[in-house]
A protein has these predicted regions:
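Residue(s) in the substrate-gating loop at a strand-loop-helix junction
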Residues: 148
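C-terminal helical subdomain
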Residues: 188, 204, 208-239, 246-248, ...
Length: 288
């Protein structure tokens, strides 16, 4: 709902957020709760999602943590059924969990390819199916999927991640066409480099990424959460099937992580090592 003053309110709404243990997911879960939603904080690391939920409760909100493997149909169904059992419905889903591995396309390990697709693409489909069925039961809802700027362009050493995020955008647009008539809106956000945790901030500093952005800084996870909460709310009631870039203007000039002080092979190796070091499995934001 929206207050008369135009301020977004999510009082009475129920949300599920995947990848809620840290980074963008934790920020979004916190922001949704601050606006009045009751939140299921889902993710692969139960300690992290329970910590996010505890912080929400300490601030006066309602939330619980749940371990969820987003690539598992059973886990997605449990996420939604447990949320409905506790709070009576699901109105909002932020499908945010993601992972990635950086390697050259000719040597890309198939097991890493399969894992990336399982989390980033299959996981979105399964979350959309489970949450969408619950939203259908209450007459509609809003699904917001975290894609990436890498879903709008290619990226060196990140073929699986980029391919998975391109696939996510196709899924979002197709789902919006199908689900619009039953009141379910589906949109995607495409973050650029977000300093979502200390390691990602360190990576940005090591690659001097701020100098590559028109705004001369990386994004903050709270800025992404603000976009998600808007799309989740009735303020965005006529928005569906859309893709929102939040990258500080990076894509306007083309993504390039190259270190110009060294040759291309050395630059690729450096970026790959940094990306894989700073991207723990399960709640990853790509450098692109």
């Amino acid at each position: 709902m929206t207050t008369e003053q135009g301020i977004v309110s999510l009082a009475g709404k129920v949300a599920v957020v995947t990848g809620a243990g840290s980074g963008i997911g934790a920020a979004t879960a916190t922001a949704l709760a601050a606006l009045g939603a009751r939140v299921c904080c889902a993710g692969h690391n139960v300690e992290n999602v329970e910590r996010t939920a505890a912080e929400i409760r300490a601030a006066g909100g309602e939330a619980f943590g749940l371990r969820v493997d987003v690539a598992s149909p059973e886990d997605n169904d449990e996420m939604v059924s447990e949320t409905v059992a506790r709070y009576g419905a699901v109105h909002i889903a932020h499908l945010n969990a993601g992972t990635g591995h950086w390697a050259g396309v000719l040597e890309y390990p198939l097991e890493e390819w399969d894992r990336t697709m399982a989390v980033n693409l299959r996981g979105v489909l399964l979350g959309l199916q489970a949450a969408g069925r619950a939203m259908r039961d209450v007459g509609g809802g809003s699904v917001v999927v975290t894609a990436s700027a890498a879903g709008l362009t290619g990226g060196r050493m990140s073929s699986a991640y980029s391919a998975s995020k391109h696939g996510v955008l196709g899924l979002v647009k197709s789902a919006a066409l199908e689900l619009g008539p039953i009141g379910i809106r589906v949109n995607a956000i495409c973050p650029g480099f977000i300093a979502s945790n200390d390691l990602m901030q360190q990576m940005g500093q090591e690659l001097d990424l701020a100098s590559r952005f028109p705004l001369r800084r990386p994004g903050r996870r709270e800025e992404v959460a603000d976009l998600v909460t808007f799309l989740a709310s009735d303020r965005a009631s006529f928005i569906t099937g859309s893709v929102f870039t939040i990258d500080g203007g990076w894509l306007a000039g083309g993504i390039d992580l190259r270190d110009d002080s060294v040759d291309q092979a050395t630059s690729d190796a450096r970026v790959t090592a940094l990306a894989n070091t700073h991207s723990p499995n399960g709640d990853v934001r790509s450098p692109v």
